[in-house]
């Protein structure tokens, strides 16, 4: 009896293993709009030679004609069959989204169940925000997050580059922003707050922080563009701007004693120097980020 039960258990385990020994569309996150499977699986090659892409196919164009324009641009149909993989899309961006769905299945297993996937985005803006002011991570971390966004078929990364806790972007016209307020004492915001908001410099052994050079940003933007992801920079204003007042107290508002208040959290809208500062900063930011939007906080 024990032997029979053991054999039955082994048979069950073999059955379960065989069922899960290949990947399928239900493993894709987020779930595609439509997907179906059929018997059989295809062993995906590693060089991409078995993936054929067809752009602006008339039949596919008719299929997506009723979708919003942004959805048409990113829509795709992915077909896995005995002869390989076919991708139909209107644009290179749509084909890229299809490849990411294929990659997500491949990460589970190279054996992909025969399937047909039709997918398009339901939302035009799909992304995350990285708070680089309070928690600076650096270029390689940002690129890793871009890869994760691409795999999830997202299309926006919001970089929160400035806040009271540190300025994170090279601005040639205002070097104090990176020389004096890109580094602080206290790794976490609460540690820094508890110490009285001290800033320091890169040579301090207790320094935490850093900033992105313009070349860093150009590299990040190019890396994101290859993955069809836009980078939205955030330059916080007029609040959450104590770091600016600490770096350039001459544009801070003055107190009743007639002296600047560098610990003020807000930019001084009554000081003409504030507007000169913002205009100059934004000119340099616009040169780095070739997109429609710049975020100013909220």
Outline where the language-model segments fall.
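Acidic, contiguous N-terminal accessory segments
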Residues: 2, 7, 12-13, 20-126
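Feature activates predominantly on carbohydrate-active enzymes
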Residues: 71-277, 281-295
